[in-house]
Amino acid sequence: MAHATHASITFDEGPHLAIGYATLRTGDFRLQPVHIHPPLANVLAAAPLLLQSDLPDPRAVDGWEIASLSAITDAVVWQYPHPARMATAGRVPMLLLSVLLGALIYRWAKDLGGWRAGLLALTLFTFDPNCIAHGSLITTDMPAVFFMVATMYAASGEWRMASGEWRMANGKWRMANGEWRMAAVGVLLGVAQLAKVSALMLVPVVGVLLLIQGLANEELRITNCESRITNHASRITIHVLRTWAVVFGIAALVVWAGYGFEISAVPGGPFPLPAGTHARIFQSLREHYELGHPTFLMGRVSNHGWWWYFPVAFVLKTPLPILFLGFWAVLRLMLECWNAGMLKRLNVKAFERANVQTLACRTLPGLSLFLFPVLYALSSLFSTVNIGYRHLLPLLPFLYVGLGVWSTKYGVGSRNGEWQMANDKWQMTNGELRITHHASRITHHASRIPPYSLLLTPYSLLLTSYSLLLLWLIIGTLAVSPHFLTFFNEIAGGARGGYRYLVDSNLDWGQNLWDLRAWMDAHGEDHVYYAHYSPARLDVYGINADFLPPDPRAVAFAPWNPAPGLYAIGATVLQGPYAPDVNTYAWFRGREPLTRLGNALWLYRVPPRETPTWAVLCAGVSFSSDTVAQRLGGGDLRVLWPDCAHTSVYPPGQQPGVLIASPDTAVPPRAEVDVTLRSAGGETESVVYRLSGSAPTPETPLSAVEVDGPLDFLGYTLHAETVTPGDAILLETYWRVRDVPGRPLSLLAHLLGPDGSAVAVGDGLGFPIEQWQPGDVIVQRHSLAVPVDARPGTYTVITGAYWLDTMERWTITDATGQTGDTIRLYRFERRE
């Protein structure tokens, strides 16, 4: 209940409430195909809203005629002045269904393994933070899970009267339940279809279970402990077909009743269909899968997801104690099979000798428990809509029941698993494991453990281990309260580290508006810039905010130079999904937040700073001048395009600028990383550096040198002290633009050998003269490769400039008044 009363209305809850209320108020299902969900969960959640007299009539909302879901949701939910009242009212039915689901999990596990199994399964469900979070929110998830589990429980045959079970009686396998149970299966199957479209996967699974039950329910004659089928295949076929007709016929009728027995047209269909809205929902779902859905996984952003999304989500969002129990169960089962020799003894002949009915009876409980979750898990690998761990919720009840039953039968609390003292040896009572499978019988005696200490008995160790795991689960869940939605296990770094791996409904669903208001009140803040994909209206929460992209109400925003103020940014848009592009909030992504509200809403304080007036775009950067100007806040921005690998440019004045380059581009030493931009695949694509207004000073200034040309020579920096054959001498020459020339030119850099000839040449100019302005400082980087066969002697580094069209060098006058066409910068002595 803590999560239900603490969380603000989340992204999906608004449409669910609005559609449910509109359906109940009008009896019209026009919004269901738009939302791509059947109506059951919506109307269950919205039923309490019928008691609210201050909600508008959906038919009076502008947009009703065109089935505008956003307009109806805004009018019914987001503008409602009492969001806490609406959220609590809508979440109560979801909480009740969660309680019923817990009871169902307990009952199923108890039927299979006794009350200890039921209690363990219920404990795992009760303290799973994911179930707590989604079980208290208005979505289709928990209703769908409940009716899926209820359908499978009924179809399994475990739903029985006190005497009802699969057993041998009068030489026949009989199930105590009658045809009424088949009708109940049909009703539950139909209701599940009305809860969520993914419940369609129940249909083939239920069909298989009914087929197996049909095989198991046929009359058999018992001879020499082996069963033989006496009825003809036709009788089995008729029985199964009759059962299918009853169950699926009732399910179809329930679905039709759920839509008010409507008969409506389906786009592309030749004639109207019963429950045509349901068919249109599947058409919308197909379009949705084709278009994809924004999603994030470990730094990557995609609209069509990855096959490994849900496996990663399961590993990172499932509590580690549950993962350990599951791993231990699988490992123990494999060891049991290996020790018993099952893998060696089962063969084709055993299958041939096995009785079909015996097989059916013995495999039915396991298939009932694991067939659906296995198929569901496999289907998730092919999903192109990867929006959250919540789509794995249907797996969890089956996992809990399985762990509860396994743990009590082969772990703690089982009559087959209790260790007792016998003949001065620790021995497992009833340790004989009999597995009869296809007429094969395997007997496995329990291992015997020396009596070192009562506390070190296998049973005591198991009991202690289970107790510690459950304690770990409970403490870990309570530690994240009331922010259960943001739970991540220790592999992901806990709730505070989960944003690096998964977002959206895994972490940030717009649930922290009450936290934001409380923080602003506590710190005396009266305004915030708010960035989130939820269309919530913050004024109904008492928050004065300006919205940022992707909200259609967004104010002007400069992603690389945000205005000063307080910013609240959801972890989802921070990582890229739903935002205009993956780097909309990259400026914030590279900075530590002021605080994190509920692990999902990040607060930043942006201080005032000067707006850049110039930008340098290096090769490999795909931004246009207009794009750069917009992301820096507009205004009069000068954009330069030098060859950044060899040239740096600094406009005159003291105004700051930025340099945008690929991550492997060499940048000036004083450049500070301001924004790191990444691709949709997660790799660093380019980096925005912030540069101070003044140009750097050369290590060796030579301002007294006069150059007969449009440039003034300022000095140089030499990154070498010796001449080493095979190495390169790195030289930086500094020039200031005096005038803009009308002809091409180049800057000279030579290494002269002992005889005065050039042994290395590094001429070049990486800044087109078309972009020059008087006062620009050009830093040209030259590389002079020393020959590997360089002779001993004196080597001289010189520089200068010349016109490219005539190759005429400029006249240069040094400080002594001597003239020439080069400037001697440095001399090296190369000795033997």
Question: Where is each model-derived feature located?
Answer:
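Interfacial juxtamembrane loops and adjacent helix segments
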Residues: 25, 29-93, 266-304
